[in-house]
């Protein structure tokens, strides 16, 4: 009897499917602990926070008032008032640089150029005796080598990017509504093309209609500029509008 033979067909060689890679970490916070010391008590504002945000990502910090959202943002730039506040432990890395060990001169270089902050009340960020355009131009001059004319032109570009006519460059903060003031602050925050924007409940002081307009503007800028953003908010709805990955603080 003829022996049965099995013929095996060789399968074509295929290259392995590459595994998805996590985005390169832009901001990496590990075990952050921040306390506020008073004569009567110690407030544990942030207790062991871990978070990572990659380039071009958005992350929402969600929590009630007093949950530590603002403290977290201030800690990144070492802006915690000491006393009474103090970073008690943990690590904060930005683009591979240890922010807790950075010298004051280096921190001044980073603030406003690589990392910007948008605070709740725009009036705390705007000087009432200078025009809005000059205040944006000042941020540009602090971090970029350019002429006065070039700084003015770029500041005008920033105003137009956030929906304010260039013709309003020489107007003062009191001539703007609350929502328009916040647009000016946003223009200041993006003037030097930062890698990261820390938005600390920037719509809290605005009415509901203006909140929606500012949120829509931030979403458009996020997509256009590909800037990483952390958005501190309560309630959670704001982070959902901005397509953020929420983190409970």
Cite the ranges covered by each PLM segment.
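ABC ATPase NBD coupling module
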Residues: 87, 99-116, 134, 142
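ABC ATPase NBD Q-loop/coupling interface
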Residues: 91-109, 147, 216
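A short, proline-enriched helix->beta-strand linker immediately N-terminal to the Walker B motif
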Residues: 191-195
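Conserved ABC ATPase signature
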Residues: 171-176, 180
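Conserved ABC ATPase "signature" region
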Residues: 94-98, 138, 149-167
